[in-house]
Amino acid sequence: MASTSTALPVRTKRKLENGKKKPKTPKDEFGEKLDVKPVIKPADEYDYDSSDEEDLRNTIGNIPIQWYDDEDHIGYDKFGEKIAKPAKKGEIETFLEKMEDPDYWRKVFDKQTGTDVKLTDEQIEKIHNIASGKYPTIGYNPYEPFLDIYSSQKEIHPIDNRPEPKARFIPSKDEMRMVSRMVHAIKMGWAKGPKNKKEEPKAYDLWASEDALDNVTKSQLSRMRVHMPAPKVALPTHAESYNPPEEYLFDDEERKKWEEAEKEDRVLNFMPSKYDALRKVPQYDKFITERFERCLDLYLAPRQRKMRIHADPTDLLPDLPNPNDLRPFPTTLAFYMRGHTGQVRAISVEPVHGELLASGGEDGTVRIWMMATGRCIKTFQMDGEVTSVAFSPVADRTLLAVAYEGKYVAILNTGCGDRLHVQQTETLLAETPTESQEDGAIVTWRKSKDKLVLKMPNEVRQVTWHAKGDYFASVAIDDIAKSVYVHQMSKAKSQCPFQKRKGHVQAVTFHPTQARLFVATKIHVREYDLARCVLVKKLITGCKHISSMATDANGENLFLGGLDRRFCWMDLQMGNKPWKKLKHHTAAVRSVAYHKKYPLLATVSDDGTAMVYYARIYSDFSKDNELYPVKRLRAHERTSNDLCMLHTTWHPTQPWLITTGADGTIALFTY
């Protein structure tokens, strides 16, 4: 049955614009629209967040650019189109951009986009910080001042001043229950204490009373205090092994020698024997004897406690001054004087000005050298090898005494220097009365051209002048009684002051101010008074073989060099024994020289060194003489017969040292 009804209004849905509902417009009670401001929602951080990949202008993706090095493009964009490579700039464009663009220095090339990116000030500052080793963050200070909140200031009030709770002052009920249970267990006998350990019986100490110091007397305490342990037995050596090496076993000759020797003379008190195994070694038959001798040694041999002084070795060395404070002394090799062939055995310097140097060598020549230039200005050919030369100490005479092999001594006129002095020397040689000598004289004088020649009975080792220049002495090489002769030039006479042999004479020298003669044998030096012909003093040198001798300017000190490598300083006013004995050389000392003006002393040796000493001699008896080594000089080479430096002398006015060598050279050392 159809019924009629009124049509109900159908509610239609409002169309959405752009798929969104239109917001309702708020109205008031009268139906008028209200002016409502929209509420701004907080922005979502993911709406504006973007990664580095999304910010790239070249959206080819995060792929290596080198994949497209051989292609004409650098990738594809989001639409699939090829992205062409940007055109490369030429050198001219790059140069123009560098000149015209003021921001060129802050641009970098970005491989991802293929373009130049301009760096900001913040980025540049970060780069500078990284390059200089600083933190990249701008303005970051890693050393901020530490703010000590609690201990920087002294507080008078506590930080937490809450009062103690009341429960702290009330006894604990739990503890009360525990104590009551323990008391009840003790009353009932349930609580048991720790078990007592059974004491084990102790061993009786037999020596307890010996160790106790209660009943020890004072004498026993003193003996205990100074007790010295017995020396230990020496450890066995290889020879005492049951299987020693073959070199420790005796052969027939050594066995016979050991059996024939006395017990005290034997190096070993047993004969080494060899066994293959330790089980084959028999019982030692001398065991009880050695133990008994050991007991006798401990019982009879007294022991002595030696107090050792623990001192630093450097404290025992004397304090040496700075060598720079002791200058001048020779330090540098100035030049060599070459001309001799073979050994240069002797040299002598003109004693007043030191302008001339005379040298004699194994080649039989005597050469005169200019000291300033080292040039040889004159040469004398002798009839034998020259052994000694000596300039006359008189200033106005150009005399030179030369000893050479063939048993001759010659007095030469060097012919060098002042012409007036040369003429006076020629006149002196011509006026020497060689014809007035007695018949049968041991030493004969004769004139030969411009020189005097003395025929000696033996080969001459050395010639030396007296300070006044009229007397000179000669020493023979042979060990005979008449080995020393004193010659007087003004009378052309020679005499032997010693008729008895006192030893093998090695060197002689005159006292510089008195009529005395020093004669050096191998181990002694004797001082003779020539005026009274008596022995003044005999000196004990301590050398085993004296080789050279020299005196100071006053004749109060004597300097000796020996073939036993020793150098001795004899102070004649202190006694007959050396004041100083030094052993700075490793070979024989050949010559000693003392400077006339400076406190300098020199020794030369076969080890190829010349030792220079600072030798100060005081006239004040309250001061001791000073001797300090200051320099070691080297200039000559050692020959096959182990000879090197043979002679030395000082320049009379300068601190210059002249040395001769077996290599045929003459060396001059200056400061």
Curated annotation (Swiss-Prot):
What the entry lists under Pfam families is as follows: BOP1NT, WD40
A Gene Ontology molecular function term of the record: ribonucleoprotein complex binding
Q: Name one GO cellular component term.
A: nucleoplasm
Region annotation Disordered: where it falls in the sequence = 1-36
Could you provide one GO biological process annotation from this protein's UniProt record? Answer: maturation of 5.8S rRNA from tricistronic rRNA transcript (SSU-rRNA, 5.8S rRNA, LSU-rRNA)
Keywords, sorted A to Z = Nucleus, Repeat, Ribosome biogenesis, rRNA processing, WD repeat
Primary location recorded for the protein, binned into one broad class: nucleus
Composition-biased stretches, type Basic and acidic residues, lie in 15-36
Q: Where are the WD repeats?
A: 339-381, 383-422, 424-455, 456-497, 500-538, 584-623, 640-671
Q: Which SMART domains match?
A: BOP1NT, WD40
PROSITE patterns this protein is in? WD_REPEATS_2, WD_REPEATS_REGION
Record's subcellular location: Nucleus, Nucleolus; Nucleus, Nucleoplasm
The UniProt entry, under InterPro entries, shows:
BOP1/Erb1 (IPR028598), BOP1_N_dom (IPR012953), WD40/YVTN_repeat-like_dom_sf (IPR015943), WD40_repeat_dom_sf (IPR036322), WD40_rpt (IPR001680)
Q: Tell me which family the UniProt entry assigns to this protein.
A: Belongs to the WD repeat BOP1/ERB1 family.
Function, as annotated: Required for maturation of ribosomal RNAs and formation of the large ribosomal subunit.
Name this protein carries in UniProt: Ribosome biogenesis protein BOP1 homolog
Q: Which organism is it from?
A: Caenorhabditis briggsae
The opening ranks of the lineage are: Eukaryota, Metazoa, Ecdysozoa, Nematoda, Chromadorea
